[in-house]
Amino acid sequence: MGIKFLEVIKPFCAVLPEIQKPERKIQFREKVLWTAITLFIFLVCCQIPLFGIMSSDSADPFYWMRVILASNRGTLMELGISPIVTSGLIMQLLAGAKIIEVGDTPKDRALFNGAQKLFGMIITIGQAIVYVMTGMYGDPSEMGAGICLLIIIQLFVAGLIVLLLDELLQKGYGLGSGISLFIATNICETIVWKAFSPTTVNTGRGTEFEGAIIALFHLLATRTDKVRALREAFYRQNLPNILNLIATVFVFAVVIYFQGFRVDLPIKSARYRGQYNTYPIKLFYTSNIPIILQSALVSNLYVISQMLSTRFSGNFLVNLLGTWSDATSGGPARAYPVAGLCYYLSPPESFGSVLDDPVHAAIYIVFMLGSCAFFSKTWIEVSGSSAKDVAKQLKEQQMVMRGHRETSMVHELNRYIPTAAAFGGLCIGGLSVMADFLGAIGSGTGILLAVTIIYQYFEIFVKEQSEMGSMGALLF
């Protein structure tokens, strides 16, 4: 059934816009240039407002997810990377459940990627329609059908641009992937802004700066009681404080420390005697993929819950899925879940919230750990990184594990890879929960993504440098 399904969508994949693979080896400096151009286009789209919207000042239901999904309210990047990640999530679950069978052949892999892109475009249209019809940009009946259609077209074109930018980097023209680049940029921008933002906010304590570091110096300069000023800068509520900043730096350090954990399996050449090497299996074997897929799952649940609560407010089943409330204090207007499934799957706002509602905290911990371990375990099967795939790669390179025959390599790799994937996903979920409970800026998930992505770019840079020999040769 799986192969038939991929064959059915083959004609549709043929008409999709596609980036051709490079016909020659792309130099590192060219990759840097293409990566910079891709990032520039993304940042420009983040600043171009959608034409025709009446208002985007209402409470934002996706405020907590925007950092992770690289989206910006009221702009062309309203949907961010959500459609790409959601399509990846759906295809992964279908392949993991064996509803779709993906073979080891390049043809099947290409069809699978094409199907993912096709679903991404369909989801872009679906999400755009939901955003417009639920009144995120004003009452649809007041805007008129023409304006509603225009907004949907803008969001679709922007979604297509994101798909192609991601594919451009994935095909080898740039460094890493578009998804990783956009997420890391958005998260780092948020952390820097929350630390140094000069924006003033009127609170019950008077006018304060949003940025934690600027607020620290402002409070010390304007308050006569310096001890109280320090206490306020470290512990103030509803705005970024110094403790949040310290927690962020601490989580950064912990994640970087865990990145170094790995098991090196000894391998040797089957052709040349005396040629030995190691095959590293990292603790974070699937990197940040589990947390990205988990974020996509939650964000789509939020979309469905918001849409239903807007249309069927008061319905028992809708309330069971999620009840929402608006918050306007200490920053932009935002909607947050206060009851239902969405509430229990959202992180507690602070350690105090954990103590106030331990059941919420417990359910959130179980969900994060379980979903990350599950996504990590299933991802290796569809991404070509399972024990069988690794054994095949080693065989093609004429490498074997020391002390094992070719036939027993899969069995030996199976002792390590699925365990590393599941335990690594569990650790990623645990670190994300810890960061959320500590109140780190940008959310635990966001920081985890930023660190793992930056570390990936560091590894790419080191690899390219070792191949080129020097920094000068690398860039010039």
From Swiss-Prot:
<keyword id="KW-0812">Transmembrane</keyword>
<dbReference type="GO" id="GO:0015031">
    <property type="term" value="P:protein transport"/>
</dbReference>
<feature type="transmembrane region" description="Helical">
    <location>
        <begin position="145"/>
        <end position="165"/>
    </location>
</feature>
<keyword id="KW-0472">Membrane</keyword>
<feature type="transmembrane region" description="Helical">
    <location>
        <begin position="173"/>
        <end position="193"/>
    </location>
</feature>
<feature type="topological domain" description="Cytoplasmic">
    <location>
        <begin position="166"/>
        <end position="172"/>
    </location>
</feature>
<dbReference type="Pfam" id="PF00344">
    <property type="entry name" value="SecY"/>
</dbReference>
<dbReference type="GO" id="GO:0039019">
    <property type="term" value="P:pronephric nephron development"/>
</dbReference>
<feature type="transmembrane region" description="Helical">
    <location>
        <begin position="77"/>
        <end position="96"/>
    </location>
</feature>
<comment type="function">
    <text>Component of SEC61 channel-forming translocon complex that mediates transport of signal peptide-containing precursor polypeptides across the endoplasmic reticulum (ER). Forms a ribosome receptor and a gated pore in the ER membrane, both functions required for cotranslational translocation of nascent polypeptides. May cooperate with auxiliary protein SEC62, SEC63 and HSPA5/BiP to enable post-translational transport of small presecretory proteins.</text>
</comment>
<feature type="topological domain" description="Cytoplasmic">
    <location>
        <begin position="376"/>
        <end position="420"/>
    </location>
</feature>
<dbReference type="GO" id="GO:0005789">
    <property type="term" value="C:endoplasmic reticulum membrane"/>
</dbReference>
<keyword id="KW-0217">Developmental protein</keyword>
<feature type="transmembrane region" description="Helical">
    <location>
        <begin position="421"/>
        <end position="441"/>
    </location>
</feature>
<keyword id="KW-0653">Protein transport</keyword>
<feature type="topological domain" description="Lumenal">
    <location>
        <begin position="54"/>
        <end position="76"/>
    </location>
</feature>
<comment type="subunit">
    <text>The SEC61 channel-forming translocon complex consists of channel-forming core components SEC61A1, SEC61B and SEC61G and different auxiliary components such as SEC62 and SEC63. The SEC61 channel associates with the multi-pass translocon (MPT) complex.</text>
</comment>
<feature type="transmembrane region" description="Helical">
    <location>
        <begin position="118"/>
        <end position="138"/>
    </location>
</feature>
<feature type="topological domain" description="Cytoplasmic">
    <location>
        <begin position="97"/>
        <end position="117"/>
    </location>
</feature>
<keyword id="KW-1133">Transmembrane helix</keyword>
<feature type="topological domain" description="Lumenal">
    <location>
        <begin position="139"/>
        <end position="144"/>
    </location>
</feature>
<feature type="topological domain" description="Cytoplasmic">
    <location>
        <begin position="262"/>
        <end position="288"/>
    </location>
</feature>
<feature type="transmembrane region" description="Helical">
    <location>
        <begin position="241"/>
        <end position="261"/>
    </location>
</feature>
<dbReference type="InterPro" id="IPR023201">
    <property type="entry name" value="SecY_dom_sf"/>
</dbReference>
<keyword id="KW-0811">Translocation</keyword>
<feature type="topological domain" description="Lumenal">
    <location>
        <begin position="310"/>
        <end position="354"/>
    </location>
</feature>
<feature type="transmembrane region" description="Helical">
    <location>
        <begin position="355"/>
        <end position="375"/>
    </location>
</feature>
<keyword id="KW-0813">Transport</keyword>
<dbReference type="InterPro" id="IPR030659">
    <property type="entry name" value="SecY_CS"/>
</dbReference>
<feature type="topological domain" description="Lumenal">
    <location>
        <begin position="442"/>
        <end position="445"/>
    </location>
</feature>
<feature type="topological domain" description="Cytoplasmic">
    <location>
        <begin position="463"/>
        <end position="476"/>
    </location>
</feature>
<dbReference type="GO" id="GO:0045047">
    <property type="term" value="P:protein targeting to ER"/>
</dbReference>
<feature type="topological domain" description="Lumenal">
    <location>
        <begin position="194"/>
        <end position="240"/>
    </location>
</feature>
<keyword id="KW-0256">Endoplasmic reticulum</keyword>
<feature type="transmembrane region" description="Helical">
    <location>
        <begin position="446"/>
        <end position="462"/>
    </location>
</feature>
<comment type="similarity">
    <text>Belongs to the SecY/SEC61-alpha family.</text>
</comment>
<feature type="topological domain" description="Cytoplasmic">
    <location>
        <begin position="2"/>
        <end position="33"/>
    </location>
</feature>
<protein>
    <recommendedName>
        <fullName>Protein transport protein Sec61 subunit alpha</fullName>
    </recommendedName>
</protein>
<feature type="transmembrane region" description="Helical">
    <location>
        <begin position="34"/>
        <end position="53"/>
    </location>
</feature>
<dbReference type="Pfam" id="PF10559">
    <property type="entry name" value="Plug_translocon"/>
</dbReference>
<dbReference type="InterPro" id="IPR002208">
    <property type="entry name" value="SecY/SEC61-alpha"/>
</dbReference>
<feature type="transmembrane region" description="Helical">
    <location>
        <begin position="289"/>
        <end position="309"/>
    </location>
</feature>
